[in-house]
Structures are given as structure tokens and as C-alpha cells.
């Protein structure tokens, strides 16, 4: 789902998504797919 994450303009972050980003999915079991709010 890494490619899908990129397609949705997201990036992979280990652990949790830090502000100012929000979770939009998963890259893997321990890696969140995040997207910047602005």
C-alpha cells in the first residue's frame, strides 16, 4: 500500500503521524500513511 499512499499524496511515518499531518491509511503494520493538512 506504499504506492497507494504516495498516490494519495501521503507519506510513510514510523509510529504515529505527527502534527500537522493526519493518518489516511497504513504503509505496513508499524508504519502509518500520513497526509499533510496544509
Curated annotation (Swiss-Prot):
Domain of life, source organism: Eukaryota
GO biological process, alphabetically ordered: defense response to bacterium; defense response to fungus; killing of cells of another organism
Location in the cell: Secreted
Pfam families from the UniProt entry: Defensin_beta
Secretion signal, residue range per the UniProt entry: none
Keywords, ordered alphabetically: Antibiotic, Antimicrobial, Defensin, Disulfide bond, Fungicide, Secreted
InterPro entries: Defensin_beta-like (IPR001855)
Tissues expressed in: Secreted into the stomach cavity.
Disulphide bond pairs: 5-33, 12-27, 17-34
Subunit structure and binding partners: Monomer.
Protein name (record): Spheniscin-1
Organism: Aptenodytes patagonicus
Amino acid at each position: 500500500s506504499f504506492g497507494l499512499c504516495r498516490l494519495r499524496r501521503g507519506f510513510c511515518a514510523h509510529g504515529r503521524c505527527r502534527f500537522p499531518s493526519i493518518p489516511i491509511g497504513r504503509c505496513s503494520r508499524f508504519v502509518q500513511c500520513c497526509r499533510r493538512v496544509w
